[in-house]
């Protein structure tokens, strides 16, 4: 009974702390036509302190989405265009000698912002990618002999173009695993496309004004961490991730030859975190199986390695995740 009272009290607090979510979503909807899944994913990443890898062809409002979100929160935004000649110092910053003061001064790089768009992350060499990924993991950057904390909240949205893969530096599996979500975005619907044409021809880009603050986001994060996950839901999350490693244990023998490696414990942690954030967005103080299923594809698609057999059969990690969540017993 005490637990029920706690949940009730938590629901009231969630109702209070999540009021800004409606304002954020409506603010995004005024600027971004369609792409609801992209907006939801950005909110999940923001509320659960996770980073997002976005895959989609150019022109699908990836840059506009994160820029609009930063304006709605009145936060700093920066964009890094990854190119083959980029250096780690171009991302994190460097020491510059000042002749006037006769000493070295720190010049901070574009990574020092609340929202960082790493555009076409697979266009830059591995040492540049790892400089950004280290900053993402540690939430701090070392320039010279000094260590600097990155702003809070700190959200990186990296993009990849799935078509032009020539001359790129694909992210290693260990690096990809650091992204909480990998979101694949698709073209808008026919009606959405017509609306985009109308708005752009009219030249009416709505003005974006802040609807919340970075402090409100940090308060909301602490409430998200309190969202209740029952033991049965924990078991459900663990079963889904274990099914990516040992499919034959879950009557999925046909997947055994398709998967070269499954999700790490980081997959389980991120699945739980994302499900909590999703429950918060839905104004609930507890996680239900539907929350887990809603975020499973985005959390797991980049954490499953495919065998040559799977690739030859045109089986995608997307299909594997779908088979797993349809087979694993729901509590």
Where are these regions (language model features)?
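Conserved alpha-helical scaffold flanking the Walker A/P-loop in AAA+ ATPase domains
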Residues: 41-44, 97-117, 146
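P-loop (Walker A) phosphate-binding loop of NTP-binding proteins
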Residues: 57, 91, 159
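Pre-Walker A (pre-P-loop) alpha-helix and adjacent loop at the N terminus of AAA/AAA+ ATPase modules
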Residues: 13-60, 242
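Walker B catalytic acidic pair
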Residues: 56, 119-120, 131
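Walker A/P-loop
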Residues: 46-83
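Canonical AAA+ ATPase core
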Residues: 98-103, 120, 124, 128, ...
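C-terminal engagement/docking regions of AAA+ P-loop ATPases
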Residues: 1-15, 247-331
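Conserved C-terminal "switch" segment of AAA+ ATPases
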Residues: 10-18, 31, 168, 182-254, ...
